[in-house]
Amino acid sequence: ENMTYNQFIPYTDRLDYLAPLANNVAYALAVEKLLGVDDKLPERCQYIRVICCELARISAHLLGLGAFAMDVGALTVFLHTFNEREKVYNLIEALTGARFTTTYTRIGGLSRDLPDGWTDELSKFTKEVSEAIEEADKLLTRNKIFIDRTKGVGVITRDEAIDFGLTGPNLRGSNIEYDLRKAHPYLIYDQLDFEIPYGEVGDCYDRYLIRMEEMRQSVRILDQCIAKLPKGPINLDDGKIVLPHKQKVLSSMEELIHQFMLVSQGQNAPAG
C-alpha cells in the first residue's frame, strides 16, 4: 500500500522462485489491464515477455521432472535436467542481470532490451534442451520400473482437481482442457502455433507426460518468437506510465518529469 506499482515488482520474484520471470509478467499485465494499456504494448515487448514466460516454464518443468525422477530412483535424469536448467539461468542472467530475482518487467514495458547476441544463444539452447528432453524420454517413458511406480499412482479426478484449485499441468493432467494461453490469449500467444497436452486418468504418469510435452511446445514457441521477433521500442510512449531511463535521471533532474521545464528569460510581467 505504500509503494508505487513498479516498486512492488521485486516482490513478485519471490512468489515462485522457479519462474520469477513469469511472475513479473503476470503482475505487470494485471496492472496494465487496470490502466487500460494492456492492448497497447509495443509488439517487441510482447514477444520478449512471451520468451521470458516460456523460459520460466521450461526451467520449472526441468526441476519438477528431475526431482520427480530422482524420487523414483532415476538419478541420471536429475543430472541431465539440472544441466539444462543451468543453461536457462545463464540466459536469464545475461538478460536481466540476476538468476532468480529478475525484476525484469516494468509497467508498460521492460527494464532493458535484449543484449547483443542473446537470441543466438537462445537458439542454441532450444536445440540442446530438445535433445535433453528426448534423452529423458528414452530413459523414462517406456521404462518398466518408472511406469510401475507412476502409473495409477496419485490419481486426481477431474472433480477433485477443480475442488483442490489445481492449475497448470496438474490441472490438465486430470483431463481438463484449460490453458490461459488458449482460453484467454494474452500478449501474442494467439499469433503462435502450439498445442496444449492433456492427461487421461490424472495419475503421476500423466502429469509426467504433460510436463515433457509442454517443454517441447515451449521450445516450439521460442523458435517462433526468435524467427518473428520485430524491431522497435520495448516500452509504451507514455510519460505518465513509463519511467524515464535511469541514466537520464542521474544526469538531468528534469527527466523525472520527462523534460518538462519552465524557463524564465527575465522579461517584465505585463502591467496589471
Annotate each language-model stretch with its function.
Residues 1-272:
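Metal/cofactor-centered catalytic core regions of large enzymes
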